[in-house]
Amino acid sequence: MEVRVESLRKEFGRFPALVDVTLDILSGELIALLGPSGSGKTTLLRLIAGLESPTEGMIFFGDEDASKRTVQERNIGFVFQHYALFRHMTVLDNVTFGLKVRPANRRPPAAEIRRRALDLIDLVQLSGLEKRYPAQLSGGQRQRVALARAMAVEPSVLLLDEPFGALDAQVRKELRRWLREIHDRTGYTTLFVTHDQEEALELADRVVVMSKGAIEQVGTPDEIYDHPVSPFVYGFIGQSNCLNVTLANGEIWFEGRPIGLRAANEPDGQATLFFRPHDVELIEGGSGCLAGRVTASRRVAGTRHLELDLGKTQSSIEVELPPELASSADRTRIALRPTKWKLFCGE
């Protein structure tokens, strides 16, 4: 099922939670809505679900306007962060609930309901636990039950609101891989909300980065990480360094010195330079580069992270180096140059 939102605006009182949001979602896509708290991602999800009504704008399921439809009429599967399972019901009863409460003219026969539920319980790898109650399950198992329940109604769209937020880190990693496999097998159009960028980049076909009620960028994980279109996206996705620089005759200057980088097609003036901690090379000598005093050094898995104080403006950056290279750079000052970087002029 294709989903399209056009010029959505949502106000709570006088506060605009969403501002002119337009988004096209292809049938069968797995979309991540990613952003910090207050960015509007959960509000957008709730509008698509029908749990909130837009102040302005329209929502389409396929070619039909779904803006005025109820939640039931939209046939949404919704998975909440805290499971929302019925504690007095078994796993099987939880999964079959959505089908059993349908009107008689839309309710499958009892045997079909049971068959569908058992198939889904098997799909989410909980066979043998049909008679257990939620209190007898782990957090990861409860979330699997919640997903099976959402899929039991054969939803037009599957929506997940921070589905792994209440789980510990290792379980989250396991469930991320599992959810991607489930999506590939079922093909439901799926949107999930997260503030975890690693989760979004690993799981999604496309990522929608949101900030202050608006969409900053939509793209594949590679596009979002490698080609951010705004300072916010560059700073929010992954680790990054940010320096206020000056452009003069196509050359980039920092603290009154050229740093060996050129941006020939950019106008002279103030700009902001972004680069990733691992996208640097060490330079012998002190000209045409960034130079700083090492203020901290720590081992992080297979790399060593160095913090550098760059001087007058109290600017500091972090670089990541292989341990063997970092050990040779383990001195009071080092010089470096970004190998991949992006400039935002007038920022």
UniProtKB/Swiss-Prot annotation:
One of its GO terms (cellular component) is ATP-binding cassette (ABC) transporter complex. The keyword Cell inner membrane applies. It catalyses: sulfate(out) + ATP + H2O = sulfate(in) + ADP + phosphate + H(+); thiosulfate(out) + ATP + H2O = thiosulfate(in) + ADP + phosphate + H(+). InterPro entries: AAA+_ATPase (IPR003593), ABC_SmlMolc_Importer (IPR050093), ABC_transporter-like_ATP-bd (IPR003439), ABC_transporter-like_CS (IPR017871), Mo/tungstate-bd_C_term_dom (IPR008995), P-loop_NTPase (IPR027417), Sulph_transpt1 (IPR005666), TOBE-like (IPR024765). It is found in: Cell inner membrane. Part of the ABC transporter complex CysAWTP involved in sulfate/thiosulfate import. Responsible for energy coupling to the transport system. This is Sulfate/thiosulfate import ATP-binding protein CysA 1. It comes from Rhizobium meliloti (strain 1021).
